[in-house]
Regions:
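Bacterial N-terminal signal peptides that target proteins for export
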Residues: 1-12
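Electrostatic cytochrome c docking/interface patches
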Residues: 17-36, 48-53, 102-125, 143
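Stable alpha-helical elements in mature extracytoplasmic
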Residues: 35, 53, 61, 68, ...
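The canonical Cys-X-X-Cys-His
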Residues: 39-46, 97, 121, 126-134, ...
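Conserved small-residue-rich
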Residues: 119-157
Length: 200
């Protein structure tokens, strides 16, 4: 995507948002909303699309969202589609976009979960809690994100990508996580995903 096209998309998004909300009396417009508008096609206007394989952005930590955008834009986290959008977000203002989604009310995934899978995942999560905590909330000080309420399909896909070293390949900070993923059979990832998706 060329710079001129990115600029056009950003300006068009801003014009549309102002047209929709300019006459509203609900308070000042969040400065990040116009810049995050292009994300809404996949992630929803409030950062929660309801799709099983698309992550919930609403209420996620801003530091994590910012890092994810930067990693996608640089190619460190491979995804051709996300790379182009993330580069545009960097130009528009990554702090505003990450802050906007972080300020939205957390909306856990509505995907229906199998209760038996949740319980199996709970039993299998003993090694995960070392880093992500007993409630799955992570540790911002160590760069560990909150897993709770994410769509199970998304969580399962990410675990499989880590196991195959296809997410952030070569990243030494994720070496221990990837080693752990390789000890887990593929069929167990669905259970772990269901468990963490069930947490609030």
């Amino acid at each position: 995507m060329t710079n001129s096209i990115r600029l056009f998309v950003g300006c068009a998004s801003l014009i549309l948002v102002l047209a929709l909300y300019g006459g509203a009396a609900a308070g000042p417009l969040d400065p990040g909303y116009p810049k995050a508008f292009s994300c809404s096609a996949c992630h929803g206007f409030a950062g929660a699309s309801g799709a099983d394989t698309v992550p919930v952005l609403a209420g996620m930590q801003s530091w994590y969202l910012k890092k994810a955008i930067q990693d996608y834009a640089s190619g460190k986290r491979p995804s051709p589609e996300m790379e182009s959008y993330s580069k545009m977000v960097l130009e528009l203002g990554v702090d505003d976009v990450a802050g906007y989604f972080a300020r939205q009310k957390r909306q856990p995934s509505p995907v229906r979960l199998d209760s038996a899978a949740v319980e199996r995942g709970r039993a299998a999560s003993t090694q995960c809690v070392v880093c992500h905590g007993a409630q799955g909330k992570g540790d911002p000080a160590k760069g560990i994100p909150d897993l709770t309420g994410q769509p199970p399909g998304y969580l399962k896909n990410q675990m499989l990508l880590f196991k195959a070293d296809r997410r952030s390949p070569g990243d030494e900070t994720l070496k221990a996580l990837k080693a752990l993923m390789r000890t887990i059979p593929d069929e167990a990832f669905g259970d772990l995903a269901a468990y963490y998706s069930s947490l609030r």
